[in-house]
Regions:
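Acidic, glycine-enriched active-site microenvironments
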Residues: 1-337
Length: 337
């Protein structure tokens, strides 16, 4: 149903985001739109287990989704998952408990005519972890890197090996945070790593930061969020020198105590200089506006259009939000818009 080259897909068979093809029957086109509305791509996965092969012996195509609640970690037992399923026609279960919870890996393949396909890993999980990534310079000490709060992944470092966890979700969810702490203990035991340094995000309210600050590991190091993005990009491309990093990220606690967003950072993996940035915006509703883009749009429009016209501009494009927009602006401090 989709045109895509699979020459770069690894044998672990991750979910691959494929571009929808317009040259399909109407009912298939409608099905694809229902699966991923307003999205040019759909996730496709080949069978990677004997159970999948048995099921697909009777079906040409299966639409699959996870059994866990949104933002919740994978359920490991029948007792955890069955109460949340509600009314379903059939349940296929097994007595084996899921001991090491791991989401599916997700990959995107870039295809350009005349060029070799390039596979980009968007979520490194099942089939890829905990196989370590190789570092260009060995570390003299064992390190625990806690990661951020959203779409969390932590890492353990020993020598030239960086052992990344699977995708753990958003840590503001209590069950996800509990799983985060448990997975750290399990991986430390698995690889017999005893960190002497713990690295965390600068954001003081991040659950991962608070975990690090409460840790018994004495040496702690805070890293600015956007600098971490720059360092990750340099490492992924095996670039050891300086570079200009343009980081368009939703949120990051800055070294000046404000929330950063679109940043131009000049530096390397060890240090960087903030040489440019987007103009600061009002964040209606605080950091919650990061999850609701219309609030950020409202914050950008307020100083340009004023309160009344900004509300009308946002409400015109999303009429269902008119009341919410109006109430939010009324709740904001009276400033000279």
């Amino acid at each position: 149903y989709m045109k895509q080259h699979f020459t770069r897909i690894p044998p672990a068979r991750p979910i691959v985001l494929l571009r929808k093809c317009c040259e399909v029957e109407v009912d298939i086109e409608r099905m694809l739109e229902d699966l991923s509305p307003n999205n040019a791509r759909v996730g496709v996965m080949l069978p990677y287990s004997p159970l999948h092969s048995l099921l697909l012996a009777h079906f040409d195509l299966l639409v699959m989704t996870s059994a866990n609640e949104r933002e919740e970690p994978i359920s490991g037992t029948d007792e955890e998952v069955l109460p949340s399923l509600g009314e379903v026609d059939f349940i296929l279960t097994h007595t084996r408990r899921i001991w090491n919870k791991c989401d599916d890996s997700v990959m995107l393949v870039h295809h350009h005519e005349g060029l070799e396909d390039r596979a980009v890993m968007l979520r490194r999980a099942r089939g890829f972890v905990p196989v370590p990534l190789q570092l260009p310079h060995p570390s003299a000490q064992e390190i625990l890197c806690c990661g951020g709060d959203l779409k969390n992944v932590f890492a353990l470092v020993r020598g030239a090996n960086a052992y990344l966890s699977a995708h753990l979700g958003d840590l503001e969810n209590a069950a996800a945070f509990e799983n985060f702490a448990m997975q750290i203990e399990r991986m430390q035991d698995m690889f017999r790593i005893k960190p002497s340094l713990i690295v965390h995000d600068l954001h003081p309210a991040y659950h991962s930061t608070q975990y690090a600050l409460r840790s018994t590991i004495q040496r702690k190091l805070g890293v600015q969020h956007h600098h971490a993005h720059l360092a990750a990009c340099l490492a992924e491309n095996q670039h050891e020198g300086r570079a200009l990093g343009i980081i368009f990220d939703g949120t990051g606690y800055g070294t000046d105590g404000t929330i950063w967003g679109g940043e131009f950072l000049l530096g390397d993996v060890a240090q960087c200089e903030r040489v440019g940035r987007f103009a600061p915006l009002t964040m209606p509703g605080g950091e919650q506006s990061i999850r609701d883009p219309w609030k950020m749009a409202l914050g950008a429009l307020l100083p340009i259009l004023g309160r009344t016209e900004a509300v009308e501009c946002v409400a015109k494009r999303a009429p269902e939000l008119r009341q919410s927009v109006a109430l939010l602006t009324l709740a904001m401090p009276m400033v000279d818009f």
